[in-house]
A protein has these predicted regions:
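Helical hinge/lid and interdomain linker segments adjacent to catalytic or ligand-binding clefts
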Residues: 1-37, 93
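Long alpha-helical segments found as membrane-embedded helices
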Residues: 14, 90, 144-150
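Sec-exported extracytoplasmic/periplasmic mature domains
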Residues: 14, 18, 22, 43, ...
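Detector for methionine-enriched segments
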Residues: 17, 62, 127-128
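An acidic, glycine-rich "communication" segment
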Residues: 26-124, 149
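Short loop/turn segments at secondary-structure transitions that flank enzyme active sites
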Residues: 97-99, 132-135
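Oxidoreductase and adenylate-handling cofactor-binding alpha/beta cores
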Residues: 123-133
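Short, flexible loop/turn segments with low-complexity composition
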Residues: 136-146
Length: 150
């Protein structure tokens, strides 16, 4: 549990993020204090200013595959993202999305506002973002690829 005193795990997570990784904080809702503690640990490795911000309605998660109107809030808590190096590096959902996607979904009042179809669409969009975290930077290789194809 990265909320605990396991500093090595937080350091590994920060190293993963710095190397281009993406992670989702799954499970129970993360408090502001939890996110601040995690951010402090990530800051030590990344050596940059990091801040969790609400996911805006025009974010790439809203349109990476399915077109979504909004991400569901729980008790007024919005989904939050951590930007690093010009990309979304971490996501803190306000619901337990994976609980809805299990064979026998377990829901809390927060998850009950979503249908399984809506949860699946959100999950697919998150996967698309996570698999193409820095596709814009990868476009620098496009001229070389096109040259080889000619």
């Amino acid at each position: 549990d990265i909320r605990g005193k396991n500093g090595a795990l937080r350091d590994d997570l920060a190293t993963w993020m710095v190397r281009g990784g993406f992670f989702v904080l799954h499970g129970a809702v993360w408090s502001d204090a939890d996110l601040q503690n995690l951010t402090a640990a990530l800051r030590k490795i990344s050596r940059t200013e990091l801040q969790w911000t609400p996911i805006p309605p025009d974010h790439e998660i809203m349109r990476s595959f399915y077109l979504l109107d909004a991400l569901p809030e729980c008790a007024g808590r919005a989904w939050r993202g951590l930007q690093f190096d010009g990309r979304l590096a971490a996501l803190a959902p306000s619901i337990d999305l994976l609980a809805l996607l299990k064979d026998k979904p377990s829901t809390t009042p927060c998850e009950s506002v979503l249908t399984r179809e809506q949860a699946t669409r959100i999950f697919v969009n998150i996967m698309m973002v996570s698999l193409a975290t820095d596709y814009k930077k990868d476009q620098i290789h496009l001229p070389e690829i096109l040259k080889r194809l000619r």
